[in-house]
Structures are given as structure tokens and as C-alpha cells.
């Protein structure tokens, strides 16, 4: 969906992607831990080739984790410690995972050729990243994924079938249906403030509301981005590695929150907020 695409496309700001204005991801660690950490991160880097540049590698990892979250509602990995100098983080598909507090059971996919047995994994060996609770006040992310595509944005399925059959559909109010779909998705994604790509004022929104949504959505994205950085640093702590990832010169969630509050209070002009956003 467009909602998923927008999260994935905005999780890494353009300034960070291009190292613009000194925006970059940095790793603070001991020199003798650097190779181990880079190998751990590269084991997470499943959809990209092995990366030697640490800034690029960290950005790829953030994208990888977000991709799993927006597809499955969470990102789950198994910690495979071969030795103190060889640790791999293996991605798992969250489907058919059952949490029993002290351990997880992963049910195998159906296979007609051979018998597959459930896999028991200690929770000490699992690393799970979920959507921050602040972004799930009204609806869980999994609920959003289940419901956001249930209505066609153009017309109901039955009406579409009538159209294909050349039946008379002149009495159908397409505009009203479109408005109802907009309201439904707007409510479903209200914790995120997604603008549904409504960038200009129209019959459904005003310019003020559209700008508010743009700030709110970027604020939500920054919350998710900083949450992932926190979880990566927490992973290092679990592995007994003294290291910390941080983003330099990137707009923080607190800065977005402040701008959002000032905009709602009328303490910042349209020109100032547009300049801040772009």
C-alpha cells in the first residue's frame, strides 16, 4: 500500500541518505570490536550486498528492519553465537510464532514432501523489534495492515463488476464512496498522521490540515527511526559489546514535536514550517 511505501521511503531522510549538511550515521565503539560489529550488522543486511562503509551499512540495516516491520508488523531475529568473535543475526518470518514468555515456538510451513517439526527458541536467543506503543494508541500496526486495503479506493467490488458488465451505474455516488474511504483510512492511521498523499487543499482537506499531517507523519517516522537505533544499541548491550550507534545532524522526534505544537498554536508561519520540512 501507499502507507507502507511512504514509511519505507521516509525512514531515511534524503539529507542522511546523501550525507547532506553533515548528516550521517556513526558507530562509537572500541577499535578491536569494530570488525565484530560490522560482521554482525552485515549478517542483518540480507537484501543488500556486504557493505564496508559503516554509515551506509547502518542505513541499510535500518531499512531492512523497517521493511520487515511494515510487512509483518514486527521484525524478529535469532541470535546465533558461534564464538565470541563470530555472531550472526538471522532474520525469521514472524508468521506462526507463539510466545510462551520463556521461549517461542515457531510452527513449520506445510510441506507435503517431508515432515517438519516445530522449532523451540529460547527468548534469550531472540531479538524482536516492534512498533513503539506511542504509534499504537488506537490501532496496532498489525490491525492497520489487515484493514487498510479492505476497500478499493475507486469503488466497491460489486459496483466494479457491474461496470465491467456494462450495467448501468449512473446512480452510484463515487464521490461519497471516495470520501468514506478517506475517512476510514484517516481514522485507521491517525496515530501516524499519514496524509494519504493529500498535499494540496481539496474537497476533503484544508491546507492547514495537510501541513499538520505532513509534520505529524514525519514526527511518527522519527519516533520509529530512533526506536530502531535504540534497539540496535540494546542488542550490542545484550551481546556484551560496548558500542553505540547514533545519527548526527538529523532532525529528532523532539524537534518535530516542538514544531508540531508551535504550528498548532499559531506560533510559526506556513513559510517557516515548509522551510523546516523541505
Name each region found by the language model.
Residues 56, 194-278:
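C-terminal helix-loop subdomains that flank or include functional centers
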Residues 1-188, 262-278:
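Structured, contiguous alpha/beta core segments that scaffold functional sites
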Amino acid at each position: 500500500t501507499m502507507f507502507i511505501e511512504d514509511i519505507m521511503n521516509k525512514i531515511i531522510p534524503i539529507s542522511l541518505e546523501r550525507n547532506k549538511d553533515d548528516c550521517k550515521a556513526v558507530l562509537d565503539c572500541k577499535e578491536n570490536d569494530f570488525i565484530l560489529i560490522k560482521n554482525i550488522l552485515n549478517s542483518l543486511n540480507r537484501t543488500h550486498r556486504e557493505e564496508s562503509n559503516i554509515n551506509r551499512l547502518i542505513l541499510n540495516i535500518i531499512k531492512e528492519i523497517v521493511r520487515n516491520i511494515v510487512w509483518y508488523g514486527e521484525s524478529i531475529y535469532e541470535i546465533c553465537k558461534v564464538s565470541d568473535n563470530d555472531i550472526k543475526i538471522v532474520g525469521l518470518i514472524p508468521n506462526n510464532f507463539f510466545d510462551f514468555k520463556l521461549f517461542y515456538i515457531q510452527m513449520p510451513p506445510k510441506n507435503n514432501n517431508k515432515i517438519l517439526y516445530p522449532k523451540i527458541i529460547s527468548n534469550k536467543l531472540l531479538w524482536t523489534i516492534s512498533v513503539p506503543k506511542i504509534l499504537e494508541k488506537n490501532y496496532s500496526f498489525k490491525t492497520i495492515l489487515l484493514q487498510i486495503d479492505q476497500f478499493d479506493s475507486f469503488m466497491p467490488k460489486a459496483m466494479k463488476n457491474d461496470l465491467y458488465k456494462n450495467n448501468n451505474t449512473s446512480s452510484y455516488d463515487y464521490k461519497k464512496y471516495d470520501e468514506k474511504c478517506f475517512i476510514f483510512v484517516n481514522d485507521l492511521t491517525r496515530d501516524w498522521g499519514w496524509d494519504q498523499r493529500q498535499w494540496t487543499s481539496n474537497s476533503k482537506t484544508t491546507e492547514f490540515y495537510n501541513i499538520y499531517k505532513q509534520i505529524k507523519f514525519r514526527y511518527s517516522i522519527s519516533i520509529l527511526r530512533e526506536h530502531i537505533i535504540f534497539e540496535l544499541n540494546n542488542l550490542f548491550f545484550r551481546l556484551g559489546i560496548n558500542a553505540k550507534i547514533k545519527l548526527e545532524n538529523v532532525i529528532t522526534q523532539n524537534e518535530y514535536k516542538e514544531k508540531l505544537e508551535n504550528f498548532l498554536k499559531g506560533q510559526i508561519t506556513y513559510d517557516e514550517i515548509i522551510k523546516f520540512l523541505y
